[in-house]
Amino acid sequence: MEAIVYTFLLVGTLGIIFFAIFFREPPRIAK
């Protein structure tokens, strides 16, 4: 059970950091 909890926390932290950077500096996609 602990492995699941640690994995959930790790994914959640990475997700928050990713979305924070993504919304702070939106990537400019060349069409």
UniProtKB/Swiss-Prot annotation:
Found at the monomer-monomer interface of the photosystem II (PS II) dimer, plays a role in assembly and dimerization of PSII. PSII is a light-driven water plastoquinone oxidoreductase, using light energy to abstract electrons from H(2)O, generating a proton gradient subsequently used for ATP formation. Its main location: plastid. Keywords: Chloroplast, Membrane, Photosynthesis, Photosystem II, Plastid, Thylakoid, Transmembrane, Transmembrane helix. SUPFAM superfamilies: Photosystem II reaction center protein T, PsbT (SSF161029). PSII is composed of 1 copy each of membrane proteins PsbA, PsbB, PsbC, PsbD, PsbE, PsbF, PsbH, PsbI, PsbJ, PsbK, PsbL, PsbM, PsbT, PsbY, PsbZ, Psb30/Ycf12, at least 3 peripheral proteins of the oxygen-evolving complex and a large number of cofactors. It forms dimeric complexes. This is Photosystem II reaction center protein T. InterPro entries: PSII_PsbT (IPR001743), PSII_PsbT_sf (IPR037268). The chain crosses the membrane at residues 3-23. It comes from Ostreococcus tauri. It holds the Pfam family PsbT. The keyword S-adenosyl-L-methionine does not apply. One of its GO terms (biological process) is photosynthesis. GO terms for cellular component: chloroplast thylakoid membrane; photosystem II reaction center. Belongs to the PsbT family. It is a single-pass membrane protein. It is found in: Plastid, Chloroplast thylakoid membrane.
